[in-house]
Amino acid sequence: MRNKIFIITIMLALATLVCSGQSFLSKFPKLTKKNLSEFFSDWEAYSDSIVSRVVKNDSLIDMVVAYNYLPMQLEGRTCLPGKEAPPKYHVVPQYIEVERYYLDVDTTVFSPRFGFPYHCSELKDNEYRIDSIIPQLPYRGLYLTSDISETLSTFVGGRRNGDKIEKINKGNLKILKKYIPVDYGHWGGYWWFTSFPLITNICYADNLIAVKIRTSWWTGEETWYIKKDDEFVRREEPTGKWIE
């Protein structure tokens, strides 16, 4: 009887893993040009399955994310204006980290050009919380995870290995760009497989929401929503612009 219970438990655990993880990656121990199309079909199916199970419980943050990802919701917009041969898919991280601060921050003392005012005194456990949300999937969208990114990086090469950087597989890189955006990090050894603008983090205080955005693989800014009369109002001009 115990053996049967153990077997059933293992089967349930495996079923949960298959349903919730990127189980399709096990089909592709080595990504090649021949199986790349199938890989993207499975990746798209995985992303759609995540969308179908997402529980939305923070309408304000969802609205903020949707507004900043609006360009990717428009049919046919899979690249920045001016680029030729846009890729087939948009790619966004599966999770966006949200830092929640249960207090007001001083938006006067801390000038907007310095970005979100992190210089708070030591906070108690009940004054902040860090969690994450799954953003809305854009038009022709795919969710990127660290495992999927690793698979793609192996396919195109150019990764850092100690003090050396692997040779880039230019043939694989060319075909991959037909499917998704691909940018090489300017320090070398890593890739960006995401669409831009890209939300990297959200800081949510009682009177301020700061959305940290990468506008490209080498530039970024923050968008502020300041609370006025019990409503968060978007500041038209971005704050805290930076260049790497």
Predicted stretch roles:
Residues L208-R214:
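Short beta-strand elements that form the blades of beta-propeller/WD-repeat-like
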Residues C203, R214-G220, W242-E244:
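His-enriched metal-coordination microenvironments in redox/metal-binding proteins
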Residues T223-I243:
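Short beta-strand edge/turn micro-motifs at domain boundaries
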Residues M1-T32:
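Bacterial Sec-dependent N-terminal signal peptides
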Residues T194-P197, W217-E222, E236-E237:
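Short, surface-exposed coil-to-beta transition loops
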Residues I5-I7, L14, D62, P86, ...:
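Intrinsically disordered, low-complexity segments enriched in glycine/proline and serine/threonine
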Residues Q22-L208:
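Flexible low-complexity loop/turn motifs enriched in small/helix-breaking residues
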